[in-house]
């Protein structure tokens, strides 16, 4: 049996990509952090809109010998390096995450990761072995997204592709659909309970190691 780790040494990086302070996405971030905190693990929040993160990958950020990240990316890379669980929270806009989230992938997660390394199936030195949790939301229903091929495209591009390209240990994706203004508080609370359960499960995996599939709820995708 795996010896439990000291929870105070376990860190989660929560990357939030929604501009609305009163949004359900912000509620997800707060709830996840609160639940992980109850388990005495550490979370750090990177609110991309709050810090006005620049999503544009500049020419001098392309992976070349002597690569040196810009200061904002260097600080983000330090956050990633310290974390074992990367948590992405974003809405689906026009079938994809917001540009600010894609820019985070380009500039931070993909920093100094070359096409040659990608084609050779070499994992990212910064991300290999880390775990990814995604919470996404959409105003449209899940069946509507599936009918138009958007759900499959997103899953392949952000779940399967990123996990394999960067050498992540796993990806657990929970999606909440039909998220619109004026949601019934009971509906919101039901969804936030799913967030709490997911936070507990992911924190447990980090502390105790991989658990038998029967003890873990299956990913919601």
Could you say what each language-model-derived stretch is?
Residues 1-114, 190-221:
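N-terminal beta1-alpha1-beta2 submodule of the flavodoxin-like/Rossmannoid cofactor-binding fold
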């Amino acid at each position: 049996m795996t010896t439990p780790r000291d929870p105070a040494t376990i860190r989660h990086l929560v990357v939030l990509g929604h501009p609305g302070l009163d949004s359900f996405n912000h509620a997800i971030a707060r709830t996840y952090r609160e639940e992980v905190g109850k388990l005495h693990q550490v979370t750090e929040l990177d609110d991309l809109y709050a810090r006005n993160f620049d999503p544009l990958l500049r020419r001098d950020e392309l992976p070349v010998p002597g690569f040196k990240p810009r200061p904002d990316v260097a600080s983000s890379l330090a956050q990633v390096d310290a974390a074992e669980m990367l948590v992405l929270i974003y809405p689906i806009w026009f079938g994809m995450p917001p540009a600010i989230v894609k820019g985070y992938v380009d500039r931070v997660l993909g920093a100094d990761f070359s096409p040659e390394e990608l084609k050779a199936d070499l994992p990212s030195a910064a991300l290999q072995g880390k775990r990814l949790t995604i919470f996404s939301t959409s105003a449209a229903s899940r069946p509507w997204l599936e009918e138009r091929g958007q759900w499959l495209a997103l899953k392949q591009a952000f779940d399967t592709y990123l996990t394999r390209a960067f050498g992540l240990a796993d990806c657990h994706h929970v999606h909440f659909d039909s998220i619109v203004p004026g949601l019934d508080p009971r509906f919101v609370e039901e969804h936030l309970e799913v967030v709490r359960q997911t936070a507990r499960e992911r924190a447990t995996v980090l502390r105790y190691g991989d658990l038998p599939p029967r003890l873990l709820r299956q990913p919601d995708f």
